[in-house]
């Protein structure tokens, strides 16, 4: 079967939350997080397996595609997402099976078909030109699928799946976010961790659990943030936020991160991040109604048959009007288009008129 979306109602969500599929996937995330405790970004686990190198080559192919589609139309006039992102998306989608086959030749045609859906959906929504934690989730499903098919061995690869593969994925997403001004999907405004990502904070908190000197409150020290931005995921995310939301303090534009900084230890932060991921991503219907079940992520018995809301990368604007689709004022899916902070910052730079003393 092709991967399909099945979560449409609160009853479906209850079945999902109690399912072995969710438990196994959550354990996969936690195992990856546990494997990077005490590791800086560059502290890979040696030797690096052929499978990790193949995944890095796959990401390199995706990165190459980003270079083929420069922003041309309305480059200076719109605060919303750039339409050239759709060309990037289309090229990835056309070539996803070919790219997967080139790096993982042992996979069957059926396995490639399953995995290609998650690879396509890892980079954002073509129609809305946005990105959020649901798209990030698709990338983790891709890694989980490769693990399920025997490509990755967690005893050898888990640390490098975060420190090499996930970090490279994050770098590519930063390119896409800044180049195409991707709009935030699933953002809770200033009450979210980040306009786009969740897992860098989760993995980053686990990295820091054994650090003797850095504390959660350290994110308010800009010198420390800059010093450790390339060494720890959490500080890298704070540095990125400070860069694109430079007109105000972290306390104002990211109050949830500010609240978390008051926690005494990174271990408590890490524990809280797991709980938050389960509650705010894996248990939110506006996000999970877009979740694909597949051969390696089987749908729980009793869940609604496939119908309703389907985002397939087409330009059909009626896809959010099916019966059963849950709308949300948070913008997790079909809400008001929100310009990204990146777009606002870049537009301000373009139209800024310096005073004579600058």
From Swiss-Prot:
Gene Ontology CC terms: cytoplasm; nucleus; protein phosphatase type 2A complex
A GO molecular-function annotation: protein tyrosine phosphatase activator activity
Cellular compartments annotated: Cytoplasm
Pfam short name (any one): PTPA
Annotated InterPro entries: Phstyr_phstse_ac, PTPA_C_lid, PTPA_sf
GO BP, one annotated term: mitotic spindle organization
Miscellaneous comment in the UniProt entry for this protein: Present with 2430 molecules/cell in log phase SD medium.
Task performed by this protein: PPIases accelerate the folding of proteins. It catalyzes the cis-trans isomerization of proline imidic peptide bonds in oligopeptides. Acts as a regulatory subunit for TAP42-associated PP2A-like phosphatases modulating their activity or substrate specificity, probably by inducing a conformational change in the catalytic subunit, a direct target of the PPIase. Can reactivate inactive phosphatase PP2A-phosphatase methylesterase complexes (PP2Ai) in presence of ATP and Mg(2+) by dissociating the inactive form from the complex. Acts also inhibitory at high concentrations.
Record text on subunit structure and interactions: Interacts with the phosphatase PP2A catalytic subunits PPH21 and PPH22. Forms a ternary complex with PPH21-TAP42.
Record's protein name: Serine/threonine-protein phosphatase 2A activator 2
Gene name of the encoded protein: RRD2
